[in-house]
Amino acid sequence: LQPMAIALASIADGTSMITENVFEARFRFVEEMVRLGADARTDGHHAVVRGIPQLSSAPVWSSDIRAGAGLVLAGLVADGETEVHDVFHIDRGYPLFVENLRSLGAEIERVA
């Protein structure tokens, strides 16, 4: 759940450190969070994230299920419209993801 935690940490007060000891490439998605304006960097098995008041919209690319979900959540709080590409990854793990977010009040649209 690191991508979701990093998305949250990117707009939270203070600095957060998230550690990943299993999957080496888990933090690849941090580069996409930086495209959204996140103040984040990786250092080996750690991601360090300093919270900022607001993310900005940008086109981003999902590399796996959890990264895609984290990018969508970050995009929902970003200023403007964010396009998340390669969302087929999300479909494998989160059926009805868009519909569930809409039922919670999210303004989200899936474009074919």
UniProtKB/Swiss-Prot annotation:
Subcellular localization(s) per the UniProt record: Cytoplasm
Predominant localisation class: cytoplasm
GO BP field: cell division; cell wall organization; peptidoglycan biosynthetic process; regulation of cell shape
Catalytic activity: phosphoenolpyruvate + UDP-N-acetyl-alpha-D-glucosamine = UDP-N-acetyl-3-O-(1-carboxyvinyl)-alpha-D-glucosamine + phosphate
Alphabetical list of InterPro entries matching this protein: Enolpyruvate_Tfrase_dom, Enolpyruvate_Tfrase_sf, MurA_subfamily, RNA3'P_cycl/enolpyr_Trfase_a/b
Pathway listed: Cell wall biogenesis; peptidoglycan biosynthesis
Membrane-spanning segments: none
A Pfam cross-reference name: EPSP_synthase
Superkingdom, taxonomy of origin: Bacteria
Enzyme class per UniProt: transferase
Family annotation (SUPFAM superfamilies): EPT/RTPC-like (SSF55205)
One CC-aspect GO term: cytoplasm
EC number(s) from the headed UniProt entry: 2.5.1.7
Keyword Translocase appears in the UniProt entry: no
Keywords linked to the UniProt accession: Cell cycle, Cell division, Cell shape, Cell wall biogenesis/degradation, Cytoplasm, Peptidoglycan synthesis, Transferase
Single Gene Ontology MF annotation: UDP-N-acetylglucosamine 1-carboxyvinyltransferase activity
Residues annotated for UDP-N-acetyl-alpha-D-glucosamine binding in this entry: V22
Family: Belongs to the EPSP synthase family. MurA subfamily.
PANTHER family (alphabetical): UDP-N-ACETYLGLUCOSAMINE 1-CARBOXYVINYLTRANSFERASE (PTHR43783:SF1)
Function: Cell wall formation. Adds enolpyruvyl to UDP-N-acetylglucosamine.
Protein name: UDP-N-acetylglucosamine 1-carboxyvinyltransferase
Organism, as annotated: Mycolicibacterium phlei
Organism taxonomic ancestry: Bacteria, Bacillati, Actinomycetota, Actinomycetes, Mycobacteriales
Gene that specifies this protein: murA
